[in-house]
């Protein structure tokens, strides 16, 4: 079960990495810029209703990376109440399977090959995240 609102009441949870109220535009309390895509890998593949921050999509430049994650989510019908199974959770790794169709790795651990079952291929990856989809 996921922590917080998405674990407690996923149908009502709205997830986001940044928005105009977090002060990111004024650089007051921004989400760490080197972790933004890790955040999107999480919210676009997990429970809840994800919101993409306009500035991240149109101004920052990771539009293609975000598009790939949205495509995976759409292709596999991930929704606010998708089934989440935590495969591994450590200080350097969070590995989860969603609806038996998508696997998400967050964290710096690189060697997770023995944890990924056969029949999955990498669909998206970046700084400390990777997403596999069932083929």
Swiss-Prot record:
Cofactor descriptive note: Binds 3 Ca(2+) ions per subunit.
SMART domains: Alpha-amyl_C2
InterPro entries, A to Z: A-amylase_bs_C (IPR012850), Glyco_hydro_b (IPR013780), Glycoside_hydrolase_SF (IPR017853)
Catalysed reaction, written as an equation: Endohydrolysis of (1->4)-alpha-D-glucosidic linkages in polysaccharides containing three or more (1->4)-alpha-linked D-glucose units
EC number: 3.2.1.1
Example of a GO biological process term: polysaccharide catabolic process
Gene3D superfamilies: Glycosidases (3.20.20.80), Golgi alpha-mannosidase II (2.60.40.1180)
Keyword Cytoplasm: no
Binding of substrate, residues: 1, 7-9, 20, 26, 105, 132
Disulfide bonding pattern of the chain: none
Highest taxon listed in the record's lineage: Eukaryota
Keywords assigned: Calcium, Carbohydrate metabolism, Germination, Glycosidase, Hydrolase
GO molecular function, one term: alpha-amylase activity
Cofactor(s) recorded in Swiss-Prot or TrEMBL: Ca(2+)
Site feature (Transition state stabilizer) residues: 21
Anything else known: There are at least 4 types of alpha-amylase in barley.
PANTHER family the UniProt entry points to: ALPHA-AMYLASE
Subunit record text: Monomer.
Family to which this protein belongs: Belongs to the glycosyl hydrolase 13 family.
Annotated protein name in UniProt: Alpha-amylase type B isozyme
Classification of source organism: Eukaryota, Viridiplantae, Streptophyta, Embryophyta, Tracheophyta
């Amino acid at each position: 079960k996921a922590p917080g609102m998405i674990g407690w009441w996923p149908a009502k949870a709205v997830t986001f990495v940044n928005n105009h109220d977090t002060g990111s535009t004024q650089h007051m309390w921004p989400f760490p810029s080197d972790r933004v895509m890790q955040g999107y890998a999480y919210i676009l593949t997990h429970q809840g209703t994800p919101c993409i921050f306009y500035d991240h999509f149109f101004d920052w430049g990771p539009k293609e990376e975000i598009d790939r994650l949205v495509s995976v989510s759409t292709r596999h019908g991930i929704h606010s109440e998708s089934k989440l199974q935590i495969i591994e959770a450590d200080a350097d790794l969070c590995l989860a399977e969603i609806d038996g169709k998508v696997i998400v790795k967050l964290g710096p651990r690189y060697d997770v090959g023995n944890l990924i079952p056969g029949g999955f291929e990498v669909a998206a990856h970046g700084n400390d995240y990777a997403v596999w989809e069932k083929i």
